[in-house]
Amino acid sequence: MAGRRSRNNDITVDILLRAYSAGLFPMADSADDPELFWVEPEIRGIIPLDDFHVSKSLAKAMRKKPFAIRFNTAFEDVMAGCAAEAADRPSTWINATIRRLYTELHQIGHAHSVEAWEGDELVGGLYGVSLGAAFFGESMFSRRTNASKICLVHLVERLNAKGFVLLDTQFTTEHLKTFGAIDVPKLDYARMLDLAVNRPSLQF
């Protein structure tokens, strides 16, 4: 199924949740692409929730409390921030269909945002999908130094407090590896995923 393309009206939130439970997730080639395709990596990125790393410099920055951190108060704005072009991200895989589908997931309690606020301004955030005891990180953005990093720290704290057992990052990057992200072969990931998604759904 990896790489199979679907027209906009082919995918519902029910199909999307079933895909996540099977280890697949959708992407678009660009924001203007009318189609989605399913991705099933041979090597999957995860952050072990019991081995999350916070650098000394980030911990020092967090002690200054530069942002107010909120959850699920501006989900669509976080998606818009993640979809916006930036100097380090000239294009995006988040198209209108993805924004609609994940907003619907948010409305039924399966997609969530972590937000960094500076006064009344949203300056960073991330969003992802919860299913069972798994959380699938989708994208993040930052308009201030460390904003998305601090959101990630708060996400992990919340997942641990709520009893989640899997934080899926889809792929690893050098940035995520500084937090402890590792690569997991598909078969190993499938076992971890099965254990996580077949638990009763946890409240985020």
From Swiss-Prot:
The organism that produces this protein has a lineage beginning with: Bacteria, Pseudomonadati, Pseudomonadota, Alphaproteobacteria, Hyphomicrobiales
Q: Which residues form a coiled coil?
A: none
The organism encoding this protein is: Agrobacterium fabrum (strain C58 / ATCC 33970) (Agrobacterium tumefaciens (strain C58))
Family listed: Belongs to the L/F-transferase family.
What protein does this entry describe? Leucyl/phenylalanyl-tRNA--protein transferase
List the PANTHER family hit by this protein, alphabetically: LEUCYL/PHENYLALANYL-TRNA--PROTEIN TRANSFERASE, LEUCYL_PHENYLALANYL-TRNA--PROTEIN TRANSFERASE
Q: What does this protein do?
A: Functions in the N-end rule pathway of protein degradation where it conjugates Leu, Phe and, less efficiently, Met from aminoacyl-tRNAs to the N-termini of proteins containing an N-terminal arginine or lysine.
Q: Which gene encodes it?
A: aat
**Protein location:** Cytoplasm
Please name the GO terms of the biological process aspect recorded for this protein, alphabetically: protein catabolic process
Superkingdom, according to UniProt?
Answer: Bacteria
Pfam families per UniProt: Leu_Phe_trans (PF03588)
Please tell me whether the keyword Acyltransferase is annotated for this protein: yes
Going by the UniProt record, its keywords in alphabetical order are: Acyltransferase, Cytoplasm, Transferase
The record's annotation in InterPro entries points to: Acyl_CoA_acyltransferase, Leu/Phe-tRNA_Trfase, Leu/Phe-tRNA_Trfase_C
The signal sequence is none
What EC number(s) would the UniProt record show?
A: 2.3.2.6
List the record's Gene Ontology CC terms alphabetically. cytoplasm
GO terms (molecular function) for this protein are: leucyl-tRNA--protein transferase activity
As its record notes, the protein acts as a catalyst of: N-terminal L-lysyl-[protein] + L-leucyl-tRNA(Leu) = N-terminal L-leucyl-L-lysyl-[protein] + tRNA(Leu) + H(+); N-terminal L-arginyl-[protein] + L-leucyl-tRNA(Leu) = N-terminal L-leucyl-L-arginyl-[protein] + tRNA(Leu) + H(+); L-phenylalanyl-tRNA(Phe) + an N-terminal L-alpha-aminoacyl-[protein] = an N-terminal L-phenylalanyl-L-alpha-aminoacyl-[protein] + tRNA(Phe)
Q: Is the Repeat keyword given for this protein? A: no
Q: Which Gene3D superfamilies match?
A: Leucyl/phenylalanyl-tRNA-protein transferase, C-terminal domain (3.40.630.70)
